[in-house]
């Protein structure tokens, strides 16, 4: 079984929550367009000035997604 990797985009500022929420829409569109095997996305708000959007990919798709979408960072995903 391959590892799952959580790709993360950071947003800061007063509009960070809305920006992260909107970015998740585009991540879902990318997953559908590229027919990726996992459909795990989300966004989290860490106060008024910081939020993230994320998507989870497999090891096999990590390079493709990283090069196309340029996430700010990544970490291993644990359910």
Where are these regions (language model features)?
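Long, contiguous binding/interaction regions
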Residues: 2-79
């Amino acid at each position: 079984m391959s590892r799952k990797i959580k790709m993360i985009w950071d947003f800061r500022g007063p509009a960070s929550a809305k920006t992260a929420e909107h970015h998740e829409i585009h991540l879902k569109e990318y997953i559908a367009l590229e027919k990726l095997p996992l459909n795990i996305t989300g966004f989290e708000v860490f106060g008024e000035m910081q939020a993230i959007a994320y998507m989870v990919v497999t090891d096999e798709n990590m390079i493709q997604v990283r090069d196309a979408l340029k996430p700010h960072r990544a970490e291993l995903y644990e359910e």
